[in-house]
């Protein structure tokens, strides 16, 4: 295979209309893929251990509750589209994923650049896995790239990073541990401020500090977690009395708190965005009272609000930022904290999880940063000559400045049209950027959990995937959403809401 490089503008490779394509459509990759055909490594090799009906249906003998296959069987996918079939009928289904496979795949399904970088790494002699006691260049490159995104909130070197966690629950626990460790020498600081409407994960620690709990786990909630009301503004856009009272309480009793943890966008709370003014005032109180401010950014970081971190949106920098999900765009499990140096001390076993030694998620983060922010110009000159011009161009500019505003504009237009078509069913549009919610209204005009659940179930029949988020449906698409996919989603959601209206009227 040729090692010749080029600047994208000089490429003679066949172009595509967007940066999305399946890898096996590239001639340079086809040469390898052809060698796999007819072998057990072929992607078309028979792999079902039973007929499709058995595989599609929930099998209580084979699967535990909560993990059984559901209503749709996926065959392939690209961007926001999953090529699938329906369980009940076996008929083909083109499914538009409006939840980026539940809040992970910011770049959609099968992003070619992330897969190419991972494939290149796998073809190398580099270790695919390293224990926490052994380092490599990849750790340092990814760490420095992420930390540079926080330089605007201080001087280079003001922040540190931990790259050795596997999921959002892990990093919530790690963030709380780092805050607790920093305050340990002050015995009076043992309280944690949390908020109604919050959801921080499913492990024991994250469960304790969440209002939305998946179920009671092993022990009762500790008595040092104080839940304050959901921060809101009134009709005039001013902070409510409850929000102001929260700030006053923390000002008065701040010496008793070691940390405050908050989600900038509470997705389980009907996709509620915390008012920026509240975050600014909370930051001021936490600074004055030496309370560690933690942002749980699982739902918004790495592109969903057009930035790497929410600090860039609200101009409020927390002491610790916890990030997961979109980090790898679904190409592996990884979670991180970025913390001010005062919170760098971490004790074992919190510092590193076993599966965090997998190098492929780190390769994925590096590639996702290429896609979101653009590559270093010198590195971009070394892009392969056979790479389609469209992808090469995107890697020069980054998707945050191009694809993100287009995707938001398309979603804004779609949500407005749905509200116009179904004024008695659809209430407020919540959230921001690509983290959005549509509130479902009952016949009494009040937000309805029942109808939000119904919509999240019915939508699959009509070729759209959304999630229920309390009284709203969560709409959180990938950044590379196309107009054709939005048009198909509008049709599918319109049919969904017509069914939900019938369900509502039947009661």
Where are these regions (language model features)?
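Conserved N-terminal phosphate-binding loop of PLP-dependent enzymes in the Aspartate aminotransferase
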Residues: 2-507
């Amino acid at each position: 295979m040729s090692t010749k490089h080029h600047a994208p503008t000089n490429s003679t490779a066949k172009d595509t209309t967007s940066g999305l394509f399946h890898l096996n459509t590239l001639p340079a990759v086809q040469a390898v893929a052809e060698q796999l055909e007819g072998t057990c490594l072929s992607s078309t090799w028979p792999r079902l251990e039973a007929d499709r009906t058995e595989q599609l249906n929930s099998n209580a003998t084979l699967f535990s509750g909560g993990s059984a296959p559901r209503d749709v069987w996926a065959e392939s996918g690209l961007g926001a589209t999953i090529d699938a079939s329906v369980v009940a009928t076996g008929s083909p289904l083109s499914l538009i994923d409006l939840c980026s496979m539940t809040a992970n795949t910011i770049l959609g399904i099968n992003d070619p650049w992330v897969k190419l970088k991972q494939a290149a790494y796998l073809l190398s002699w580099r270790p695919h896995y390293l224990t926490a006691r052994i380092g490599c260049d990849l750790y340092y490159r990814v760490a420095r790239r992420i930390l540079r995104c926080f330089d605007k909130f201080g001087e280079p070197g003001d922040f540190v990073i931990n790259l050795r966690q596997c999921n959002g629950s892990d990093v919530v626990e790690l963030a709380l541990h780092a805050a607790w460790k920093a305050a340990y020498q002050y015995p009076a600081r043992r309280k944690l401020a949390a908020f109604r409407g919050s959801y921080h994960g499913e492990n024991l620690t994250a469960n304790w500090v969440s209002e939305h709990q998946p179920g009671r786990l092993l022990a009762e909630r500790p008595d040092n977690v104080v839940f304050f009301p959901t921060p809101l503004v009134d009709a005039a856009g001013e902070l409510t009395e409850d929000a102001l009272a929260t700030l006053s309480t923390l000002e008065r009793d701040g010496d008793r708190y070691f940390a405050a943890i908050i989600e900038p966008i509470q997705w389980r709370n009907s996709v509620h965005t915390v008012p920026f003014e509240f975050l600014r005032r909370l930051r001021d109180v936490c600074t004055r009272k030496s309370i560690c401010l933690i942002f749980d950014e699982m739902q918004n970081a790495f592109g969903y609000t057009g930035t790497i971190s929410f600090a860039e949106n609200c101009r409020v920098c927390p002491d610790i930022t916890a990030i997961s999900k979109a980090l790898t765009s679904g190409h592996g499990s990884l979670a991180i904290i970025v913390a001010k140096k005062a919170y760098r001390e971490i004790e074992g076993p919190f510092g590193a999880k076993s599966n965090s030694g997998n190098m492929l998620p780190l390769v994925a983060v590096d590639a996702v940063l290429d896609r979101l922010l653009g590559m270093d110009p010198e590195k971009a000159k070394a892009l392969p000559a056979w790479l389609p011009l469209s992808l090469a161009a995107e890697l020069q500019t980054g998707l945050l400045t191009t694809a993100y505003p287009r995707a938001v504009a398309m979603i804004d237009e779609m949500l407005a049209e749905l509200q116009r078509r179904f004024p008695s069913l659809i209430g407020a549009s919540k959230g921001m950027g690509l983290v959005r919610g549509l509130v479902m209204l009952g016949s009494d005009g009040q937000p309805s959990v029942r109808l939000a659940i119904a919509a999240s179930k019915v939508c699959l029949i009509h070729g759209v995937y959304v999630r229920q988020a309390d009284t709203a449906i969560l709409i959180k698409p990938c950044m590379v959403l196309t107009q054709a996919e939005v048009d198909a989603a509008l049709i599918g959601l319109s049919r969904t809401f017509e069914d939900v209206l019938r369900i509502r009227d039947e009661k």
